[in-house]
Amino acid sequence: MIFHYYFYTDWDVQELLKNAIALSDKNFSELNNFYFSRYPNNIFLTVFFSKIFTLFNGLLGQDFAYVFLLVIQSILNILSGVLILKVTLLLTKSEKYAFFSYWLYLLILWISPWVVIPYSDSMGLIFPILMYYIYTHPKMHYILKSVLLSAIGIIGYSVKPQIAIMIIAIIMVSLLTQKIEMKPLTATIIAIFVVSFPMFFAINRINSTAGFDLDYEWEMTYHHFIKMGLNSETDGGYLANDVGSSISIENKEERVIYNKQIIAQRIKDYGVTGLINHQAKKTLNNYNDGTFGWGLEGSFFEKIFPNDSYVAKITRSFYYSSGKLHLIFQGIVQSIWLSILFLVLGNVLIGREKMTREFLVLMTSLIGIFLFESIFESRSRYLYTFVPIYIVAATVGFQQMTQNFKKRALKLKTGVKNEQK
């Protein structure tokens, strides 16, 4: 279906693709060193894209390579749905609830057009749910789990930094809830180090030898994104003036000092009440969009390819902002997303006896992504990679709501019978 409505977009995606093609063609003079000096976290994905372009350069051309990237993302999307099903079955021990979670996946992720945007959101979709699946796997040896989680966590972080929230949640819960035994702990640490160091070295090597001439004085540090997250003009969203003010300071140390001063000033100007109100608006921005910011980035529909087929007309009407059916698409995903968020609340009903490590990791990861969005720049798109985790949490919450309702109904029925006697 993606072949009928895919298009070229602008913003960061275009920057990655242009530079991936330049790397593939070894046209190093065309590389945007300034962009990647500012955002070095995008280098790994750009290098990966370049390898795909290199693979198809002499065969079917760049257009086919682009479509192949979308096929990869489609496969990752489908695999994410399978993992949602498996994890939910393990947690709820119910096929009924497992299939319920899969229906949620179909209605918000499988249907999602983000699969045609080759970027870290769709490429990173599988990582949190894959790590959680490995962690919850009942028969996998703990050393193998540690090795796989380390490897996948490092790759995931290189694709999209907030993916690391899942591995942080796993580490935190493990340290706080598990009894520490020196022998298995030592074996685990050794296994992690044996995997992690070579992988870190390999990824750094890939990034540093790709062909970019980076000036790390231009790097946008986390202080910039905290500053932007505190702006009142866009309620913590992207603000061109904030980007411009950071770029205007060439010295990295001076830029960090400047951003810290702006952070302190904005917090002072808000005050306690103002900061709470700002956070409320920011949370609404983050969580009140079931499309996850579809169509809002840059010149989104930059180049649309002619296609007069019936399927193309329907899908484009459904997914393109100007389409007659676009409001239906928005209505479907918005209602499903708000339902997911509501069902997540059912987890507060879970008793202590059901608070397993798996459950605690699930909740901790959601708290982690909430804090990430609360502290840094606000975008609903940044939630996309964690939607599979939200679906799992929503299904577990729905099961708990149902069980509590049945218990109360039974008590009420029993009480009425006793009164009649």
Please place each PLM-identified region on the residue numbering.
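Membrane-interface anchor segments at the N-terminal boundary of transmembrane helices
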Residues: 66-68, 285-366
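Transmembrane-helix motifs of polytopic, lipid-linked glycan transferases
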Residues: 71-92, 130, 342-346
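Loop-to-helix entry region of an early transmembrane alpha helix in multi-pass inner-membrane enzymes
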Residues: 39, 43, 58-79, 327-335
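Membrane-interface alpha helices of multi-pass inner-membrane proteins
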Residues: 145-160, 171, 195
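Short acidic/glycine- and proline-prone juxtamembrane loop motifs at membrane-interface regions
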Residues: 113-123
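Extracytoplasmic catalytic/substrate-binding loops of multi-pass membrane glycan-assembly enzymes
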Residues: 5-21, 25-60, 255-256, 272
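Transmembrane-helix signature of polytopic, membrane-embedded enzymes
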Residues: 84-107, 357-360
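Membrane-proximal stem/loop segments at transmembrane-domain junctions that anchor or position
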Residues: 208-309
